[in-house]
Curated annotation (Swiss-Prot):
Stored SUPFAM superfamilies: Class II aaRS ABD-related (SSF52954), Class II aaRS and biotin synthetases (SSF55681)
Protein name per the record: Histidine--tRNA ligase
Family: Belongs to the class-II aminoacyl-tRNA synthetase family.
Self-association state and partner proteins as the record states: Homodimer.
Principal location listed in the UniProt entry: cytoplasm
Taxonomic path: Bacteria, Pseudomonadati, Chlorobiota, Chlorobiia, Chlorobiales
Species per Swiss-Prot/TrEMBL record: Chlorobaculum parvum (strain DSM 263 / NCIMB 8327)
Length: 430
């Protein structure tokens, strides 16, 4: 019988790599707390209609990339979430969250699912962190989430990033721009690839998302959305840029940036990394005031958010050597059992140490002392506590500092005190 393997486009994450994930997640949570964002968690699957209405029927995500299923032949279609914003908005509307507070600031670290061709930093099951700020219509909200995102990157030590930003205007602005794009691309209709021909009819803005090298020169000559913006939209965008200038956040205005989701309006942005090659996007976001109405609300709801791909983020960090100094802490103390028959007593000692809050490891396999010491060194234990027959009878145990080789014999209460003092001294180091 053939050995089962992980599903294509998924991957297992083992303890040595988990330490990196915990570190990055810890930084995200710390920065989120600084900015007053609280964590939200939503279901892994939603009704398919949520994403069709929320993301947009003409997007690649809805058209090609969703994992959709129908558990009940007579029931509604369900989809594994391909992104988080639509689900977060659905949850907030369902709970009527903004009736409790006029502003809602939420963040998430969540697994998502898309039918993509697996490659480095792009899996069919992947993780994003992101934030959504609901209830604030002025440009300060865009600056708030952008600053939050960029502070996460700087706190992680990441460099070589490029922030591109554009204004997509409001519905009227985009309607004018779609007609301008249709007029521009129509004479080139025979030169377009099949996906772009379809987009020309349904939503010509999506042509600007094409990665087809043969179309890039044509796309570069397309009209700029900025020329279709009304004065109010221009003023809104310029205020966002002034906030970024005030915070000394470098950016490039890219008038061809439209992002891949239909719900964006006004400011939209994307961050790329020089470490990621052709697929260089590490995250992005923007305003999406009309999403609430698309999901059944009676009015638009001011909203802005971003999402960052964790796998891509960590690839960029790895290439910049930002994990090199990350040293996952092993156990503080390793309980070494000198005779197999003393294992029960050693487990009681380990229980006391753990109950007092000390990170403790113990051999349960009855291996030799040499093997146990080798294991303690491999794990990076700071101390070894030896349990033999005489130690058990006297209640005094040998405690060895594995860095200095200094060894002393103490009762268990004194050992616990010594170890807590060692933890305190380590925590006090700069």
């Amino acid at each position: 019988m053939a050995q089962l393997q992980a599903v294509k486009g998924t991957r297992d994450i083992f303890p040595d790599e988990i330490a990196r994930w915990h570190y990055v997640e810890g930084v995200i949570r710390s920065v989120a707390e600084l900015y007053g964002f609280s964590e939200v968690r939503t279901p892994v699957f939603e009704y398919t209609e949520l994403f069709q209405r929320g993301i947009g029927a003409t997007t690649d995500i809805v058209g090609k990339e969703m994992f959709t299923f129908q558990p009940d032949p007579n029931g509604r279609s369900l989809t594994l979430r391909p992104e988080m914003t639509a689900g977060v908005m659905r949850a907030c509307l369902q709970k009527n969250l903004l009736s409790q507070s006029p502003v809602s600031k939420l963040y998430y670290i969540s697994d998502l699912f898309r039918k993509e061709r697996p490659q480095a930093g792009r899996q069919r099951q992947f993780t994003q962190f992101g934030a959504e700020l609901l209830g604030v219509s002025n440009p300060a909200a865009v600056a708030e989430v952008l600053t939050f995102m960029m502070q996460v990157f700087s706190s992680l030590g990441l460099h070589g990033l490029r922030l591109r930003i554009n204004s997509l205007g409001d519905l009227d602005d985009r309607a004018r721009y779609r007609e301008a794009l249709r007029d521009y691309f129509m004479p080139y209709q025979n030169d377009l690839d099949e996906p772009s021909k379809e987009r020309l009819e349904k939503n010509p803005l999506r042509i600007l998302d094409s990665k087809n090298p043969a179309l890039q020169e044509m796309i570069a000559g397309a009209p700029r959305l900025y020329a279709s913006l009304k004065p109010e939209s221009v003023a809104d965008f310029e205020k966002v840029l002034s906030y970024l200038d005030d915070r000394q956040i470098a950016y490039d205005v890219d008038h061809l940036l439209v992002r891949g989701l239909d719900y964006y309006c006004h400011a939209a942005f994307e961050v790329t990394s020089s470490e990621l090659g052709a697929q260089d996007a590490i995250g992005g976001g923007g305003r999406y005031d009309g999403l609430a109405r698309e999901l059944g609300a009676s009015n638009d709801l001011p909203a802005v958010g971003f999402a960052v791909g964790m796998e891509r983020l960590m690839i960029a960090m790895e290439k910049q050597g930002l994990f090199a100094t990350l040293n996952p802490h092993g156990p503080l103390v390793y309980v070494v059992v000198q005779q197999k028959e003393l294992t029960d007593h050693a487990m009681q000692v380990a229980f006391r140490l753990r109950k007092s809050g000390l990170k403790t490891e113990i051999d349960l396999a009855g291996r030799s002392m040499k093997a146990q010491m080798r294991d303690a060194n491999r794990m990076g234990a700071a101390y070894a506590l030896f349990i033999g027959q005489s130690e058990m009878e006297s209640g005094h145990y040998a405690l060895k500092n594995l860095e200095t080789s200094e060894q002393t014999s103490l009762d268990l209460d004194a050992i616990i005190e010594v170890l807590h003092e060692a933890v305190s001294q380590e925590s006090a180091r700069p």
